[in-house]
């Protein structure tokens, strides 16, 4: 099996760090890892796979090195700008933001449900919202067996879904301080 070159975009954020943890556990056939983030995080060091990596600033030339797969977790605006650049250079982009979820040309994939919908030619793969993923996993076998007609599903979204700034705001407001990220006190909703 060919060894892959894998990039993590947003490597210093909460989701990016989780990507790194999962990659470390999975032990995929990888030749090189490339860790990208914002200018603010560029130059920071990340311990990963027993090595120290220096995080690079993401830019238009970041994907000029034969990257096969890029995991994006840096927010919708970053994905909208850089995913097409990566895809145009042959990279398969797996995007964790909402940027590509409603774009017909992009596959919306939950691997346990519809991996067969993946088409390498499309290059940009979106994943659904986390609450959608957790709902379709048990619903798929029920639908296959019984043919569901309608599902009513209610979720409560975690503040962590808005990233580190959301978590910081929750902690801040729990201490009685004013919010800086949310327009209201998230701990009182």
Regions found by a protein language model. Name each.
Residues 1-186:
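N-terminal Rossmann-like NAD(P) cofactor-binding subdomain of oxidoreductases
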């Amino acid at each position: 099996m060919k060894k892959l070159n894998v990039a993590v975009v947003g490597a210093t954020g909460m989701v990016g760090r989780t990507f790194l943890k999962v990659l470390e556990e999975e032990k995929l056939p990888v030749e090189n890892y490339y860790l990208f983030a914002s200018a603010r995080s560029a130059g920071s060091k990340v311990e990963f796979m027993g090595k120290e990596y220096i995080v690079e600033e993401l830019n238009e030339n970041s994907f000029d090195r034969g990257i096969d797969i890029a995991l994006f977790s840096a927010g919708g605006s970053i994905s909208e700008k850089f995913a097409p650049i990566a895809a145009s250079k042959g990279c398969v982009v797996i995007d964790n933001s909402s940027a590509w979820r409603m774009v017909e040309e992009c596959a919306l994939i939950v691997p346990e449900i519809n991996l067969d919908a993946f088409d390498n030619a499309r290059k940009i793969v979106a994943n659904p919202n986390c609450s959608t993923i957790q709902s379709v996993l048990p619903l798929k076998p029920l639908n296959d067996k019984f043919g569901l007609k309608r599902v009513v599903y209610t979720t409560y979204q975690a503040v962590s879904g808005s990233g580190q700034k959301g978590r910081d705001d929750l902690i801040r407001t729990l201490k009685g301080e004013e919010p800086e990220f949310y327009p209201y006190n998230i701990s009182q909703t």
